[in-house]
Amino acid sequence: RNAALGVSRRDQLFAGLPRLLHRRPWLGALIGWRNRSPLLAQLGERWLGVAASRQLPQPAARPYLPPAIAPVLGERSVFLLVDTFAGLFQPHIAMAAQAVLHAAGYQVHVLRPLADDAEPARPLCCGRTYLSLGQVDAAREEARRLHAALAPALASGAPIVGLEPSCILSLRDDHLKLGLG
């Protein structure tokens, strides 16, 4: 369908929201205004097909930022995969997971894009939002970024902890269908 008709504005917005919020943080404020303004909600319904009566998820004022310095890999190391929803909308979940793992005696290494990634500051994404809206090439690109970041973690033999079940399952299911893994 996307190849024949193109990707709708609505699908571009929802599938690409993690990338858009990273590149244009002011969109978070716009979402808040839309949720509080009946006029903006009506415009959103007309332009994007999002029901005016529905509240959109509000991005956090400050997204999750992993620690600037990662600990040295040790015997009690664990890798934490912070999904884009937790990182951008509910960073307290990622911080709580990190705190629980620290309290359990683990050195927590937050998975990040590799240094040679085209956008090393942009958070990792499993690509499921793209895939769910038929944007297979974009999903494959996100999956490749995630696989590249996972490779050193897998090679270390340390456990990898994910927060969002659908992201973890995308590694097992979707990424294999995309020809990865």
Task: Label each region the model flagged.
Residues 1-180:
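Iron-sulfur-cluster electron-transfer modules
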